[in-house]
A protein has these predicted regions:
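C-terminal His-loop and adjacent cap/lid subdomain of alpha/beta-hydrolase
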Residues: 2-368
Length: 368
């Protein structure tokens, strides 16, 4: 209440005084702000009390805080098993140590530096023996500052998936982030594809090191857990996105805004996470996305299954009506033709060639 001086408020967590972690709101609101670290896993009770005399002593409020393990889960449910870790053999080329790991695929966080060469390659940058400045590309950020394209690149594991944080680092290449060329904005790079999980996945260097975004001064975050080519559990993906962004906010800074970017499954994630987790994304750039989620995902889910069923009928009976391409339209509701080439003809010798269906040309091979 306005009647209580902020200096009279005491804050405790599980009975321990943490008042020193809080300060007055810099925007002038009558409230305290702060970050409490070192919480145990599970639930903790935060209590705020007014320490002044008289009635102000009656002012007391509490909040239950739940601290989750960095490998989750928070709300996505039991972990999927079996689950294959990809970092022990360094399959993703992340530079993570190839060591035996726990069932959560946890490994040490790695920070290194790279630069974009004038030959359009990402190369390792050694601060102790830097390359000649003339071999490093120059970029101009949104703020109009021209700097060498040198980046700080953090990789590790969050929620069992590989994550990446990259940002320009032209002024220094030390342990602490260099904010000199950061435009204050965050880009979340989402990826598409289709998969059923059970693996940590593979990371995309193109998505992790989003060249256009980095060159403009954005910080770029990424996770193999927000790549639908790893899994299509959007509860798990949303949870992972929250945790990866929280890592950036905690270890770097609060961005002015966060914008998503990505195509196909990367676009769908932006729609769903924007709907389910307000505040995670402030804007999105969904690319080659579906015009609507209700009618278009029918083909994604059904085409592969229907085509396989029709194929099974032809394999069982070479005289099956489903060996005639145009008949498949009766079931699928999509075009079929006896003159269009079939990209899968080598593995479909039981079907006449040429000939194909819209289901095959558009969606076959998409499902795992």
């Amino acid at each position: 209440p306005a009647s209580v001086a902020l200096s009279a408020v005491t804050v405790t967590v599980n009975g321990t005084n943490v008042t020193s972690a809080f300060a007055a709101d810099p925007e002038g609101n009558h409230q305290l702000e702060g970050v409490v670290t070192g919480l145990p896993l599970g639930k903790s009770k935060l209590v705020a009390r007014a320490a002044g005399p008289g009635k102000s002593r009656r002012h007391r409020d509490s909040l239950t805080l739940t601290n989750h393990d960095i490998q989750g889960p928070m709300f996505s449910g039991p972990r999927q098993v079996p689950f294959v870790c990809a970092t022990p053999n360094n399959a993703a080329g992340l530079g993570l140590p190839p060591i035996a790991q726990s069932e959560t695929c946890e490994t040490a966080t790695v920070v290194s530096f790279r630069y974009r060469s004038t030959t359009n390659q990402w190369l390792d940058y050694d601060p102790a023996s830097p390359p000649a400045p003339s071999t490093i590309q120059q970029v101009t950020t949104l703020d109009g500052e021209t700097v060498p394209l040198i980046i700080r690149w953090e990789r590790g594991v969050i929620n069992r998936f590989m994550y990446s944080i990259a940002m320009l680092s032209p002024a220094s290449q030390g342990p602490a982030p260099d904010f000199s060329a950061w435009n204050g904005k965050l880009l979340y790079s989402f990826s598409g594809g289709v998969a059923i999980g059970h693996t940590q996945g593979a990371a995309s260097s193109g998505d992790m090191l989003h060249l256009a975004g980095l060159g403009l001064g954005y910080a770029v975050i990424y996770s193999s857990g927000t790549r639908t080519n790893t899994h299509y559990n959007l509860q798990l993906g949303g949870e992972t996105a929250i945790m990866v962004k929280d890592r950036f906010v905690s270890a770097y800074a609060e961005p002015e805004y966060t914008v998503g970017v990505g195509g196909s499954g990367g676009a769908i994630q932006q729609y769903v996470y924007g709907q389910n987790h307000p505040g995670l994304l402030d804007a999105g750039v969904p690319q080659y996305s579906y015009p609507d989620m209700v009618t278009q995902t029918i083909h994604v889910g059904d085409c592969e299954l229907v085509e396989r069923w029709l194929d099974s009928k032809v394999l069982a009976d070479p005289l099956s009506p489903w060996r005639t391409w145009v008949n498949r339209t009766l079931v699928e509701g999509l075009n079929a033709s006896a003159v269009i080439p079939n990209p899968y003809a080598p593995v479909m010798p039981y079907m006449p060639t040429p000939g194909s269906s819209e289901c095959i040309n558009g969606w076959r091979g998409l499902s795992p």
